[in-house]
From Swiss-Prot:
Its EC number is 5.2.1.8. The PPIase activity resides only in the second parvulin domain. The N-terminal region and the C-terminal tail are necessary and sufficient for the chaperone activity of SurA. The PPIase activity is dispensable for SurA to function as a chaperone. The N-terminal region and the C-terminal tail are also required for porin recognition. Keywords: Chaperone, Isomerase, Periplasm, Repeat, Rotamase, Signal. This is Chaperone SurA. The keyword Chaperone applies. Residues 1-20 form the signal peptide.
Length: 431
């Protein structure tokens, strides 16, 4: 559930040279197709993971195990970044600036405050930008490649929407952590037995009080391994079906597994459970307006003044809104109806029109308002609350099914890319 838009300060998990310490002659840690992972990359991420683990109070495995996990992570990132280069995928400076602005805002900081925070943690801002760019590229490639493998059928959406409608007060959102013990394609029985025995051993250790996060960092091949396996919050229906079937009656703190899938053995921990609000209503407005568009015969200021005069006449009672709309309005869709726009969600209107409309009281007429269409005089006739639960449930059902299928396919896709790449770790291991 990682998203580059919500990266916490001080950690870019794919960081390379995040710490601006002087470097000796660099070494190659791994060869990955036509590129390499440098020893400095591994060391930098090692420091970053240790720093964040210390701040979070997270236990870590020994350095050798942690270094192995970090090397695997950087190899996978390298494979995907090479794919981005071959596909011609780029992140513009504007996109990068917006992403970093979002990160700062989500941390309730300005850009200057973000820079200061990074400096306090020993991070160079330009290096930080480079790492966020890499995160964006990796996300873009993964999303593009996996999305095309996911199909959501209308009947699936309808079925799940009905299930959501029938749920009342159930705790249907879970905060999970995850350990994946992978299996190769076409594993031997010995490989299956070894992975299953390890999974069973880990479950026993966890039940006896071992730290789940430390075991995830040590053993897991999931993309969230270096975060202690934390997947974050997700609806039950968003979780892969194989997991969801085992999570319907769980309690907070419960450990589930081992679960066998096509990619390996899984262990889950339920960190927390919460319910969701099932009822969805929106405010609709009933409004009418008069639109005058500036032209060669009527300047912008003249159009504004004309509507101000009309507003005063309506308030004085010398004319009425509908009559003036039929006479003056240049909106062909509503002029003949006295400017009546009917019932609608305010969000469908031009932002300037919407904002002015939402400030009006029932029966009140606005001052002349300028939008991208011209000058408007707006009157709010009424408001109402409309139950949009059915539409919201279908939208929620689609999103849940898509997210669940995406998560299932993403892990398979990543294993396929890893298996197809030439990788040589310089300590002698070759894949």
């Amino acid at each position: 559930m990682k998203n580059w838009r919500t990266l916490i300060l001080g950690l870019a998990l794919s960081a390379s040279t995040a710490f601006a310490a002087p470097q000796v002659v660099d070494k190659v840690a791994a060869v990955v197709d036509n590129s390499v992972v440098l020893e400095s990359d591994v060391n930098s991420l090692l420091q970053s993971v240790k720093l964040n683990a210390q701040q979070a109070g997270q236990q870590l495995p020994d350095d050798a195990t942690l270094r192995h996990q970090i090397t695997d992570r950087l190899i996978m990132d390298n494979i995907i970044l090479q794919m981005a280069q071959k596909m011609g995928i780029q992140v513009t400076d504007e996109q990068l600036d917006q992403a970093i602005t979002n990160i700062a805002a989500q941390n309730r900081m300005s850009i200057d405050q973000l820079k200061s925070q990074l400096a306090n943690e020993g991070l160079n801002y330009n290096t930080y930008r480079s790492q966020i760019r890499k995160e964006m590229l990796i996300s873009e490639v993964r999303n593009n490649e996996v999305r095309r493998r996911v199909t959501v059928l209308p009947q699936e959406v309808d079925t799940l929407a009905k299930q959501i409608a029938n749920q009342t007060g159930e705790n249907d959102e879970l905060n999970l952590s995850h350990i994946l013990l992978p299996l190769p394609e076409n594993p031997t029985q010995q490989q299956v037995d070894e992975a299953e025995n390890l999974a069973t051993s880990l479950v026993k250790q966890i039940s006896e009080g071992a730290d789940f996060g430390k075991l995830a960092i040590t053993y897991s091949s999931d993309s969230q391994a270096l975060k202690g396996g934390q997947m974050g919050w997700g609806k039950l229906q968003e979780i892969p079906t194989l997991f969801a079937e085992r999570l319907t009656q769980v309690q907070k703190g419960q450990v589930v597994g081992p679960i066998r899938s096509g990619v390996g053995f899984h262990i889950l921990k339920v960190n927390d459970i919460r319910g969701g609000n099932k009822s969805v209503s929106v405010t609709e407005t009933h409004a009418r307006h008069i639109l005058i568009k500036p032209s060669v015969v009527m300047t912008d200021s003249q159009a504004q003044a004309k509507l101000a005069d009309v507003a005063q006449q309506i308030k004085n009672g010398s004319t009425d809104f509908a009559a003036q709309a039929k006479l003056l309005s240049q909106d062909p869709g509503s002029a003949n109806q006295g400017g009546d726009l009917g019932w609608a969600s305010p969000d469908m209107y031009d932002p300037a029109f919407r904002d002015a409309l939402l400030k009006l009281k029932k029966g009140e007429i606005s001052q002349p308002i300028h939008s991208s269409f011209g000058w408007h005089l707006i009157q709010l006739l009424d408001t109402r609350q409309v139950d949009k639960t059915d539409a919201a449930q279908k939208e929620q059902a689609y999103r849940m099914i898509f997210n669940r299928k995406f998560a299932e396919e993403a892990q398979t896709w990543m294993q396929e890319q890893r298996a197809a790449a030439y990788v040589k770790v310089i300590n002698g291991a070759t894949n």
